[in-house]
Swiss-Prot record:
Transports viral genome to neighboring plant cells directly through plasmosdesmata, without any budding. The movement protein allows efficient cell to cell propagation, by bypassing the host cell wall barrier. Acts as a suppressor of RNA-mediated gene silencing, also known as post-transcriptional gene silencing (PTGS), a mechanism of plant viral defense that limits the accumulation of viral RNAs. The keyword Transport applies. Residues 109-122, 140-153 have a biased composition (Polar residues). The N-terminus forms a amphiphilic alpha-helix, which partitions into the nuclear membrane. Residues 1-24, 107-153 are annotated as: Disordered. The keyword Transport applies. This is Movement protein. Belongs to the luteoviruses movement protein family. Keywords: Host nucleus, Host-virus interaction, Inhibition of host innate immune response by virus, Suppressor of RNA silencing, Transport, Viral immunoevasion, Viral movement protein. InterPro entries: Luteo_VPG (IPR001964).
């Protein structure tokens, strides 16, 4: 079991540190890398984030007269939240091909979609919902359901 934990840790380190790779035949159009850190002093915690976006133009194969360009867009967004009691890592990767040039995104716009649970009061608050089940009938009544159903007593 200890070896499994070590292998998972090694894989996590590799996944966290490897950059997005570019196809050597593609022409680079846009590249963006952004890193940052946010400290939450009230919780003795911190959030580290990294965002990479690479857009390349795929070459038209010889003998093909395709006038529409093909863009390859690779994005990776990673976060690591650390507090005295927990460390949470998250990574989202996206690869797409398109005939239109994709927009450049900001890492902070992606951060707003990954809120911390302690800042969201509705996460910790349980709100009872009405039961979908009808209230129990008195024990003397039964209801049959079907084509020719009638109430029986």
């Amino acid at each position: 079991m200890a070896q499994e934990g070590g292998a998972v840790e090694q894989f996590g380190q590799w996944l966290w540190s490897n950059p997005i790779e570019q196809d050597p035949d593609d022409e680079m159009v846009d590249a963006r890398e952004e890193e940052g850190q946010i400290l939450y002093l009230d919780q003795q915690a911190g959030l580290r984030y990294s965002y990479s976006q690479l857009t390349t133009l795929k070459p038209t194969p010889p003998g093909q007269s395709n006038s529409a360009p093909v863009y390859r867009n690779a994005q990776r967004f990673q976060t690591e939240y650390s507090s005295p009691t927990i460390v949470t890592r998250s990574q989202v990767s996206e690869l797409s091909l398109s005939h239109t040039r994709p927009p450049i995104r900001q890492a902070l716009s992606l951060l707003s979609s990954t809120p911390r649970a302690s800042n969201q009061p509705w996460v910790a608050t349980l709100i009872p919902s009405p039961s979908a089940r009808p209230p129990p009938r008195p024990s003397g009544q039964r209801q049959l359901m079907g084509r020719n159903s009638r109430n029986q007593r």
